[in-house]
């Protein structure tokens, strides 16, 4: 389970590479850190390169605009912990079948995604 600081805005999220992505990565592994729009660490950079071949539209943002974190969230199986990160706007722009194909094309197991109400929008903290 990742550690978080400032959970309301997810100011910081730290997690190790999940086991299911290790076959896709180079030997250089370790912990990564998300801070604002930037991420550091070799494994997450590689995952972004794989997944962002089909980037999100610029106006589709999750929480603080972490576009790549949306992809990583579902790739590493974070969805059960944070089911409402997937906002309605994104569901309309990229239906579950689209993201399933993206995940399969990266060599990962696809997650079963379903449109859900964005809890951040309901709380007035959703940006976008």
From Swiss-Prot:
Output the superkingdom of the source species: Eukaryota
Q: Could you tell me what this protein is called?
A: Putative uncharacterized protein FLJ23865
Question: Which organism was this protein described from?
Answer: Homo sapiens
């Amino acid at each position: 389970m990742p550690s978080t600081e400032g959970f309301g805005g997810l100011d910081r999220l730290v997690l190790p590479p999940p086991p299911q992505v290790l076959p896709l990565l180079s030997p250089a592994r370790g912990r990564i850190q998300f801070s604002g729009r930037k991420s550091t660490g070799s494994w997450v950079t590689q995952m972004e390169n794989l997944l962002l071949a089909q980037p999100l539209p610029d106006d589709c943002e999750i929480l603080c605009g972490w576009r790549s974190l949306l992809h990583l969230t579902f790739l590493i199986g974070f969805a059960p912990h944070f089911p409402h990160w997937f906002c309605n706007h994104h569901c309309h722009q990229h239906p579950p079948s689209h993201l399933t194909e993206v995940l399969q094309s990266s060599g990962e197991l696809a997650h079963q995604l379903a449109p859900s109400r964005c809890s951040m929008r309901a709380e007035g903290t959703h940006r976008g």
